[in-house]
Amino acid sequence: MSNLKDLRINGHRLIRDIEALAKVGAREDGSCCRLALTDEDRMGRDLVVSWMHGLGVEVRIDRVGNIFGLRRGTEDLPPVMTGSHIDTVTTGGKLDGAYGVLAGLEVIRTLNEAAASTRHPIGVAVFTNEEGVRFHPDMLGSLVYAGGLAVGEAWAIPATDGPSFGEELVRIGYAGAMAPGAIVPQAFVELHIEQGPILDAEGGSLGAVGNLQGISWQEVTIRGVANHAGTTPMRMRRDAAYGAARTVCFVHDLAREIGGTQVGTVGSFKVTPNLINVIPREAIITVDLRNTDESLLQEAELRLGAFLRDLSDREGLEIQTRRLARFEPVVFDQRIVSIIQETAEFLDQPIRPMTSGAGQDAQMMARICPTAMIFVPSIGGISHSPSECTRPEHLELGANVLLQTVLRLAECAGVWSAGATDGSVSVNGRI
């Protein structure tokens, strides 16, 4: 493998591909909008699939639209897989998800140019509906792939704008024939921008992600009584917006009180009738709670529930909650995390251990194969925004760490145990 250790990706080419994909769904404010299974998503998929065909890989699509590009290995072994997603939020940036997919293609392109072979096949995955904006829950494609949701259930999920997941999948031509989970990887490594401020604030360039926060999403509907804003005394009001505002403050204070990695966000706030001189009769908000500790996440959920019950009693409000998504914290495979760290050291680059605060497809893949992630800095910690940015040298560096990590994994003999987090793995001394 001595010659393979000298391989490096072409950073200019990677940036070119990122810019080309960013033009699909581009908006005047500089953001990208490729909501899952829209025409823009289809065009993005078509572009990526055309690049896969150009690289000579086998392209396979499963029944929920997950795309896989597979480069042959010298032996009939499970593939080492990388990848991410290309769907975006409504005002997304150029890098979230797309960077991991395109860096994976650049790894294959680099190996092709060097006429390099690997024992294991190498795969690049493009997962469907990671963002969860148009279809709930998020990470839907990888969730189905990992066996967490049946295909039929996924197909029946309604879009926020009406049609079902299955209807839209067929409409854009990406309802594939392969059964989800048919390809079980030897390992999965996801390269991603941090989407947070830590690396940038510390002047770091790389993160080896060892775990990922658990996520609890709820929709809270608060109903009161609409009435005249000028004639209704404060003591006689049943104000839905007031109840929602109290909940916003409670979630904020709760997260600060629990401390540690606990965070809480009310990200959506809708008021009806939304008029200046009418007491709102209804408010619908979303609550996002996250923690790396499952017991503390459960505590936050219980305390929120108790608060809402008390609020309902005190203010005369009808309050209903609906679960949107719930994922437990994930601990990634520590052997792969160590390989990522060793690879960075081989490239003479500092790397720090990290936790992912955002949900990622890697957390679903960790259910079926050894998995870890690589982070590069997000300038200012900004993501899900047209201001989302990472320095080109960091994008190139992350892709080179991915290249060398994938090469080490693809040259291994032996079988990895899914879910092993203690570093125990039989690889015949090849790693």
Task: State each model region's role.
Residues 67, 86-88, 122-133, 195, ...:
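Acidic, glycine-rich active-site loops and adjacent beta-strand->loop/helix elements
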